[in-house]
Curated annotation (Swiss-Prot):
Regulation: induction: By DNA damage, via LexA, as part of the SOS response.
Organism: Escherichia coli (strain K12)
Function: Modulates RecA activity through direct physical interaction. Can inhibit both RecA recombinase and coprotease activities. May have a regulatory role during the SOS response. Inhibits DNA strand exchange in vitro.
Full protein name: Regulatory protein RecX
Gene: recX
Compartments reported by the entry: Cytoplasm
Recorded GO CC terms: cytoplasm
Tree of life domain: Bacteria
UniProt xrefs under HAMAP family: RecX
GO biological process: DNA damage response; DNA repair; regulation of DNA repair; SOS response
Length: 166
């Protein structure tokens, strides 16, 4: 940190850091708080910002007021991103929980998203195991295990086999 930046008030330095973090991608409020509290790597090693709890609260409030920090927008974008990468609803819920998003906000966003989880599970299975999907029991178990690991629900996985003749 240069001499001129070390003289800036802690609030201004925290606000600058928050805007830089949020400029890269959306974050949940909990993620932003964690990143703001982490030491900054400077030329001479890690440097702490001597900020009070009130400074952190003011920065978070400012980010909310100016639209930089919005948990509902973060959740919607996170669900869309993770589903495009082939992850199922159970895994996405778990990751959102780890990021500090409430169960109510997660469930609301999951209901509002327009994703056919069964079709997505089938796409993942055919991408990994080929078309047509194997009918041998041991191969079905492998596919089921793979899809469960990816976060798909058992009912969506079973639907693949029910609609297999289609």
């Amino acid at each position: 940190m240069t001499e001129s930046t070390s003289r800036r008030p802690a609030y201004a330095r925290l606000l600058d850091r928050a805007v830089r973090i949020l400029a890269v991608r959306d974050h949940s409020e909990q993620e932003l708080r964690r990143k703001l509290a982490a030491p900054i790597m400077g030329k001479n090693g890690p440097e702490e910002i001597d900020a009070t709890a009130e400074d952190y609260e003011r920065v978070i409030a400012w980010c909310h007021e100016h639209g930089y920090l919005d948990d509902s927008r973060f959740v919607a974008r996170f669900i869309a991103s993770r589903s495009r990468k082939g992850y199922g609803p159970a895994r996405i819920r778990q990751e959102l929980n780890q990021k500090g998003i409430s169960r109510e906000a997660t469930e609301k966003a999951m209901r509002e998203c327009d994703i056919d989880w069964c079709a997505l599970a089938r796409d993942q299975a055919t991408r990994k195991y080929g078309e047509p999907l194997p009918t041998v029991f041991s191969e079905k178990v492998k596919i089921q295990r793979f899809l469960l690991y990816r976060g798909y629900l058992m009912e969506d996985i079973q639907e693949i086999w029910r609609n297999f003749a289609d």
